[in-house]
UniProtKB/Swiss-Prot annotation:
Gene: rplV
Taxonomic path: Bacteria, Thermotogati, Thermotogota, Thermotogae, Thermotogales
Keywords from the named record: Ribonucleoprotein, Ribosomal protein, RNA-binding, rRNA-binding
Name recorded for this polypeptide: Large ribosomal subunit protein uL22
Annotated family: Belongs to the universal ribosomal protein uL22 family.
InterPro entries, alphabetized: Ribosomal_uL22 (IPR001063), Ribosomal_uL22_bac/chlpt-type (IPR005727), Ribosomal_uL22_bac/org-type (IPR047867), Ribosomal_uL22_CS (IPR018260), Ribosomal_uL22_sf (IPR036394)
GO CC aspect terms: cytosolic large ribosomal subunit
Amino acid sequence: MQVLIKRNGMKRSKFHRERKEKLASMPIYEARAVAKYIRISPRKARSVANSIRGKNVSEAFTILEFSPKKAARIIKNVLKSAVANAVNNHGLNEENLYVYTCYVNDGPRMKRLWPRGRGSADIIQKRMSHITVIVRDREAEKAANEEKK
């Protein structure tokens, strides 16, 4: 007899089936890359992520290349990975790709103690980020939208 573990209020097999269906329904003209547990403050990384959203991939690489921020180097690597996923896994053309969305979520926080006067201490929170970049093919997206009409 198979014992099913509940997750998010539903049985595990149903959870995995729904997840598989959701992934299958994702458009084939889209590729993503995720970097998790990156040691940078989400607030600092979001300003860089906002600057490349909606831009062509080549333009986004140029923006990230000349940005002096630490987050730019990290997001550039994630973008490079998303483009490689699009080209290798989906066979998309790199010239037609654009940054569909780029967002930064909070990760866990490392807590450190900072000694203060009279034997007390303050807690310092070292924040982490989860960075997601999704690229899409403009031409394939237009063709898919025309087919729906």
